[in-house]
């Protein structure tokens, strides 16, 4: 670890303006991004007494080897810059409110002629009205199933809608009166839109008018002795009331707010948020995050707002009001920033009494319970993972536990569509952003394919090491131009030496930049021998290697005549099996994709610059590929949009496709 005093900037070079600062590790990778009202005061606080900092902050300061900053004019600009850089660099020491998924919304495609009701995730689209977010997609489908009795709107995809119109029969929902069947003309576009507007009014909280109208119609039907219709209206009312029960009314004034509460200890914090729309609780979400420094509840509110409401995904739905337990120090700048994202004024406040205070206390109890459950589960997970890694290290004779494990697998069918996968586990958990897929072109069997993929992976790693100037390392490929000296200037911090392990534009590691402590191959002694030979040819002797054979689950080591046997109940074996199975899943999925693509493509797909429209025009004109291949250049150019050069390329591609297949190199 670096001594913080070795890279501490001179206080006089740090401006006293607002800005954003970045700590980087030895490779130039951004590991922490922070915002400050006064850059000089904030940065000096890290170096004044680093030993007594918060545990995670101390680890960050001693891991870093450089710090740089950007000064801006206002706090709002600093807030925006901080958010942008956290999204760009994904620093490991920043508080991160995320759970690797986007939350579902109930979406209404109001811009279509026949609007559709559906579950939708991800980025919001124009012409779509959203209700939510919900915690689970099944909650949306359950609500829809109840409301389609009363509002029989379309829920099918465009393909299903068109096919039903072509055959003249609606889908099952049309027969059971849960769809008005606009696909077959049972209702007009105007009538269907009226149904959808009624649904939107109900979801927006205007429920009393709908209930009173149905009650009145039911009474009228009963008075006119239309008992079947009255019974249907009675069932519709019951469905509406069940749907209303799922969305508890907490505020009678139609409040549009997110209620946020926290529970924390010195190392972690749990956050819970209830989404209240039109006075009703629409959804609930929660996270548990690591605290990277001594953070107040106000600081946690700041981080929550910038990360949860700043994104382009569906979760970035900024409410009119945020009810929080404590206001952050930059509350005015934060409110301005949120208002810019929403497009109208957003307020943050601490409720003091009444229903809003009671709901905030309820959310706080949920946060406390969530933190307790997380700590109990995390204690078990950490113990299990540590035990598994220690068992693997002991079995393989490693000095330290393998914190980064890479596993490779080959997938093919009789030498066709040969592909390989590389999956990465760090600290016993999958790191999917590091997964890689390989197309194997020069090998047709598993052993040669395994050799090729390992040579390609570690050649890239050796090239990166050589370019950073590590002693004793020669490039495995073409020599790269060495990095030039960093530029400096008065009042500007020295730029960190960003080696080629890190992309200087993104601050993230390049592909294959970091070596594993352990390589696992899917297979037994032959696969391990092939992998060991490939590593030896490259001169890689500091990476452990093993293979996990199927069926007996034996662990094979290079040059060993007999496998190592881990107990069937061993945590180490469970981890190796999980790594191996993940590599197999990743490889076979890629293989199926390529095989499916190959089986459905034609020779015309390989013609450069020939798009789908012109391909269809050619097939319509000639009727088949056989007739097209027999045509002359002049005949092909008769097709609109096809010139002589393109016609020659088409004939060349069709001529190649009639030749026997040759192995690709």
UniProtKB/Swiss-Prot annotation:
Alphabetized Pfam families for the sequence: GIY-YIG (PF01541), HHH_5 (PF14520), UVR (PF02151), UvrC_RNaseH (PF22920), UvrC_RNaseH_dom (PF08459)
Cross-referenced InterPro entries: GIY-YIG_endonuc (IPR000305), GIY-YIG_endonuc_sf (IPR035901), GIY-YIG_UvrC_Cho (IPR047296), Hlx-hairpin-Hlx_DNA-bd_motif (IPR003583), RuvA_2-like (IPR010994), UVR_dom (IPR001943), UVR_dom_sf (IPR036876), UvrABC_protein_C (IPR050066)
Location of this chain's protein in the cell: Cytoplasm
Ranges for domain GIY-YIG: 16-95
Parts forming coiled coils: none
Regions that span the bilayer: none
Gene3D superfamilies: 5' to 3' exonuclease, C-terminal subdomain, GIY-YIG endonuclease, UVR domain, UvrC, RNAse H endonuclease domain
Family: Belongs to the UvrC family.
Record's function text: The UvrABC repair system catalyzes the recognition and processing of DNA lesions. UvrC both incises the 5' and 3' sides of the lesion. The N-terminal half is responsible for the 3' incision and the C-terminal half is responsible for the 5' incision.
Protein name per its UniProtKB record: UvrABC system protein C
Gene name, Swiss-Prot/TrEMBL: uvrC
């Amino acid at each position: 670890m670096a001594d913080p005093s070795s890279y501490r900037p001179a206080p006089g070079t740090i401006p006293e303006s607002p800005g954003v600062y970045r700590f980087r590790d030895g490779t130039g990778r951004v590991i922490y991004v922070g915002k400050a009202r006064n850059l000089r005061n904030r940065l000096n606080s890290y170096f004044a007494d680093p030993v007594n900092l918060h545990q995670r902050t101390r680890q960050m300061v001693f891991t870093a080897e450089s710090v740089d900053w950007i000064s801006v004019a206002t706090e709002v600009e600093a807030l925006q810059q901080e958010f942008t850089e956290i999204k760009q660099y994904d620093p490991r020491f920043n508080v991160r409110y995320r759970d690797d998924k986007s939350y579902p919304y109930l979406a209404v495609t109001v811009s279509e002629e026949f609007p559709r009701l559906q579950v939708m995730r991800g980025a919001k689209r124009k012409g779509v009205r959203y209700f939510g977010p919900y915690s689970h997609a099944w909650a949306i489908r359950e609500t829809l199933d109840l409301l389609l009795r009363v509002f029989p709107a379309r829920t099918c995809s465009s393909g299903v809608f068109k096919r039903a119109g072509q055959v003249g029969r609606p889908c099952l929902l049309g027969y059971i009166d849960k769809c008005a069947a606009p696909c077959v003309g049972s209702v007009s576009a105007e009538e269907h839109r009226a149904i959808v507007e009624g649904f939107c009014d109900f979801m927006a909280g205007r429920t009393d008018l709908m209930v009173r109208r149905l009650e009145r119609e039911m009474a009228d039907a009963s008075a006119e002795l239309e008992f079947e219709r009255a019974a249907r209206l009675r069932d519709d009312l019951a469905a509406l009331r069940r749907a209303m029960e799922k969305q508890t009314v907490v505020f009678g004034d139609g409040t549009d707010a997110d209620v946020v509460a926290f529970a924390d200890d010195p190392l972690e914090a749990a956050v819970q948020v209830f989404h209240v729309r039109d006075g009703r609780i629409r959804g609930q979400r929660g996270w548990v995050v690591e605290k990277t420094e001594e953070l107040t509840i106000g600081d946690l509110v700041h981080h929550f707002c910038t990360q949860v409401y700043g994104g382009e995904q569906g979760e970035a739905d900024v409410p009119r009001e945020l009810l929080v337990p404590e206001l952050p120090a930059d509350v005015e700048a934060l409110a301005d920033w949120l208002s810019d994202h929403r497009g109208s004024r957003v307020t943050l406040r601490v409720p003091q009494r009444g229903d809003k205070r009671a709901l905030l206390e309820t959310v706080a109890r949920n946060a406390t319970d969530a933190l307790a459950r997380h700590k109990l589960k995390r204690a078990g997970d950490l113990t299990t993972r540590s035990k598994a890694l220690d068992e693997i290290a002991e079995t393989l004779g490693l000095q330290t536990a393998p914190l980064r494990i890479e596993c490779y697998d080959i997938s093919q069918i009789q030498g066709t569509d040969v592909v390989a996968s590389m999956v990465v586990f760090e600290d016993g958990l999958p790191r999917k952003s590091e997964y890689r897929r390989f197309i194997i072109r020069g090998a047709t069997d598993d052993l040669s394919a395994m050799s090729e993929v390992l040579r390609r992976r570690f050649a890239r790693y050796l090239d990166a090491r050589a370019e950073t100037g590590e002693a004793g390392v020669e490039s495995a490929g073409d020599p790269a131009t060495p990095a030039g000296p960093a530029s400096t200037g008065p009042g500007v911090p020295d730029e960190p030496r960003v080696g080629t392990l890190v992309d200087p534009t993104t601050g993230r590691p390049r592909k294959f930049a970091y070596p594993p402590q352990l390589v696992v191959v899917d297979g037994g002694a032959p696969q391990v021998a092939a992998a060991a030979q490939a590593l030896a040819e490259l001169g890689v002797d500091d990476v452990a290697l093993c293979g996990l054979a199927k069926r007996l689950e034996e662990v094979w080591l290079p040059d060993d005549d007999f496998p190592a046997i881990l107990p069937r109940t061993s945590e180490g074996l469970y981890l190796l099996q999980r790594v191996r199975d993940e590599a197999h899943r990743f490889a076979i999925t890629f293989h199926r994709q390529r095989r499916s693509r190959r089986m459905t493509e034609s020779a015309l797909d390989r013609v450069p610059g020939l798009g789908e429209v012109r391909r269809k025009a050619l097939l319509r004109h000639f009727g088949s590929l056989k007739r097209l291949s027999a045509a002359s250049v002049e005949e092909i150019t008769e097709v609109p949009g096809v010139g002589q050069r393109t016609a020659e390329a088409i004939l060349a591609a069709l001529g190649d496709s009639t030749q026997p297949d040759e192995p690709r190199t």
